[in-house]
Amino acid sequence: MSSRILTPDVIGIDALLHDHNAVLAKSASGAVAVFANNAPAFYAVTPARLAELLALEEKLSRPGSDVTLDAQLYEDSQAAPVAVPLGKFAMYADWQPDANFQRQAALWGVALREPVTAEELASFVAYWQAEGKIFHHIQWQQKLARSVQISRASNGGMPKRDVNNVSEPDDHIPPGFRG
């Protein structure tokens, strides 16, 4: 096992127990690495060195600047709903489908069990912003419905899982199996 010694002064535990005042007085830095069984066990420090270390820790724990950032920079404010443009338009970053999008998608033959997730919508908008095509609002919604249907088909009809979520075990025991 490798270890890092933070002082050039090293001594065995037996020598420290024999005369700790003399050992600490000889150390140039006010700290001695104490070894037991050829491995570092702990550090012995003089009261003066301990006071220096505590003062340094106190200094480092204070903020380094008097400048504070405004709290509103950290808050995600809800954007005001953007009115849907009339006629054909190119995709824009704040575009949203209608509130009854799932029902409309069902009328178009696309049954979505779950609402469109923010990730699915962001992916759709980013793709079509880059394309630069123009369509009516209803056509954009139809494209979104088809896009979500195709992406979910590869995942059993469900939205893609967040890779950061920890899965939970299934506690359900099917009929006919003992638990």
UniProtKB/Swiss-Prot annotation:
Keywords attached to this entry = DNA replication, DNA-binding, Primosome
InterPro entries given in the database record: DnaT, DnaT_DNA_bind
Q: Which GO terms describe its biological process?
A: DNA replication, synthesis of primer
User: Where on the tree of life does the source sit, at the highest rank?
Assistant: Bacteria
Q: Which Gene3D superfamilies match?
A: 1.10.8.1180
Listed under GO cellular component are: primosome complex
Pfam families cross-referenced by the UniProt entry = DnaT (PF17948)
Which ranges are annotated Basic and acidic residues under compositional bias?
Answer: 159-173
Which intervals of the chain are annotated as region Disordered? 155-179
Function recorded in the entry: Involved in the restart of stalled replication forks, which reloads the replicative helicase on sites other than the origin of replication. Can function in multiple replication restart pathways. Displaces ssDNA from a PriB-ssDNA complex. Probably forms a spiral filament on ssDNA.
Similarity comment: family membership: Belongs to the DnaT family.
* Quaternary structure note: Homooligomerizes. Interacts with PriB. Component of the replication restart primosome. Primosome assembly occurs via a 'hand-off' mechanism. PriA binds to replication forks, subsequently PriB then DnaT bind; DnaT then displaces ssDNA to generate the helicase loading substrate.
Descriptive protein name: Replication restart protein DnaT
Report the gene name.
dnaT
